[in-house]
UniProtKB/Swiss-Prot annotation:
Specifically blocks the catalytic activity of the chorismate mutase Cmu1 from the fungal pathogen Ustilago maydis. Hinders substrate access to the active site of Cmu1 through intimate interactions. A structural feature specific to the fungal secreted Cmu1 called extensive loop region (ELR) is required for the intimate interaction. Does not interact with its own chorismate mutases. The secreted fungal Cmu1 presumably affects biosynthesis of the plant immune signal salicylic acid by channelling chorismate into the phenylpropanoid pathway. This is Kiwellin-1. The lineage of its organism: Eukaryota, Viridiplantae, Streptophyta, Embryophyta, Tracheophyta. One of its GO terms (molecular function) is enzyme inhibitor activity. The gene is KWL1. It comes from Zea mays (Maize). Residues 1-32 form the signal peptide. One of its GO terms (biological process) is defense response to fungus. Coiled coil: none annotated.
Length: 198
């Protein structure tokens, strides 16, 4: 039968190394818990007040409502070899629901082109401009698409953004050609996907 003194000795053996690890700061803690980055999340950076306007609802776009508050983000979830995202539908054509010309090129793109816009954090100040990403759908289909624009998570509800709210922080906004190549139903408006840099 264990004694009280024996129990105290056992607690000391277990607790002291843990306490030493915690007291030696973040560097030691990262060795004790190497998956700490998985706990980091992208938090909202603020909000904007909605303003309605001439919103093109061609692809089921959500239009801003006067006075409503919309969350903004300056970040996106961490990029991995298979980053989870929500694919939304967007026309990059002139007069389409995409608003202004593509940020990367200053051009519009016909709906037959496989192009995408990425949420602000993934767009990363334009570092992915004119680069291809590989998109994988749950049905097993994949497509390579060119990054041409930012799906802005920091602003919205204005003419440049088709009077739509700021993008969520986990969006890959794909052209109709991307949806067709993936064999997805455009009437759904959004789909769960994964993507990776090529």
């Amino acid at each position: 039968m264990a004694t009280v003194g024996g129990n105290r000795a056992l607690y000391a053996v277990v607790a002291l190394p843990l306490l030493a690890t915690l007291l030696h700061g973040p560097m030691r803690l990262s060795h004790a818990f190497p998956y700490r980055s998985l706990l980091q999340t992208c938090q909202p950076s603020g909000s904007i007040q909605g303003r309605s306007g001439n919103c093109n609802t061609e692809n089921g776009s959500e239009c801003c409502k006067n006075g409503r508050r919309y969350t903004t983000y300056g970040c996106s979830p961490p990029v991995t070899g298979s980053t989870r995202a929500v694919l939304t539908l967007n026309s990059f054509a002139e007069g389409g629901d995409g608003g202004g010309a593509a940020a990367c090129t200053g051009k519009f793109y016909d709906d037959s082109k496989k192009v995408v816009a990425l949420s602000t954090g993934w767009y990363n100040g334009g570092s992915r401009c004119r680069k291809h990403i590989m998109i994988h759908a749950g049905n097993g289909n994949s497509v390579s698409a060119l990054v041409v624009d930012e799906c802005d998570s920091t602003v919205g509800c204005d003419k440049d953004h088709n009077f739509e709210p700021p993008c969520r922080n986990n969006i890959v906004d794909g052209s109709p050609a991307v949806w067709d190549a993936l064999g997805l139903n455009k009437d759904d408006g959004q789909a769960q996907i994964t993507w990776s840099d090529e």
